[in-house]
Structures are given as C-alpha cells and as structure tokens.
C-alpha cells in the first residue's frame, strides 16, 4: 500500500496537467454583441471605475461647445452611446494609447492625444 501511494504521488507530480479552460480564438477576441453593447456601463459606473483605478480622468472635466462642464466619465459614456460602442472598448483604447486609466498624472499631450488622434 505504501508503494502504491508513493507511485501515485510521483505520477501526479510528473504527469502534465491539462488545462480545461476555454480555447483562445485569435480571430474572435470579443464578440460583436459585447463590442457594440453601449449599455454595458453607465456614466456612474465608468466614474467609479476611473476612481478605483486612481485615474486622473476621475477628476478631469472639460467644457463642450455650449459652455457646459462635463466629466471624463460623461464624455466616455456619451461617445459610447453616440457611436454604439461598449464603454469598456473606449476605456481599453484610452489605456492602450496613453495609459490614461492607470496614470494619476498624465501630461497635457497625453490628454490631447488620448485615443491616438490629437486635438490640434
């Protein structure tokens, strides 16, 4: 019995473990339904996410052409709804292009070129 336990222990350690997760398809990173789900996050949820990440965008406000101030979270939400995109897609883009989600002190250039397209 003792030899059987040792053999079982050795086989358990030496045999490769096969992961039983979902397989990755490089041609389908995100589904169309997820990508275009504009209602996935509210403006308030975006704001909480930015605050949780310590993003400078959590405190960033800007003024629109009518002279109204609005938050970065509102800007993200409005863009997502206008263009029928998941707000998470825009959050990923902001992080990918200028690290604006996790950067507590972005430069003016980083903000101006937030999504890879500049404000000139």
Q: For each predicted feature, which ranges?
A:
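Short, functionally critical alpha-helical segments immediately adjacent to catalytic or ligand/cofactor-binding
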Residues: 74-101
């Amino acid at each position: 019995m003792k030899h059987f336990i040792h053999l079982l222990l050795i086989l358990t350690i030496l045999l490769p473990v096969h992961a039983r997760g979902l397989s990755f398809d490089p041609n389908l990173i995100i589904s169309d339904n997820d990508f275009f789900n504009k209602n996935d996050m509210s403006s308030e949820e975006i704001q909480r996410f930015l605050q949780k990440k310590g993003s400078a965008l959590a405190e960033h406000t800007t003024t629109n052409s009518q002279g109204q101030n609005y938050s970065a979270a509102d800007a993200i939400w409005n863009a997502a709804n206008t263009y029928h995109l998941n707000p998470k897609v825009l959050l990923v883009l902001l992080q990918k292009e200028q690290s604006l989600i996790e950067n507590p002190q972005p430069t003016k250039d980083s903000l101006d070129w937030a999504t890879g397209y500049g404000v000139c």
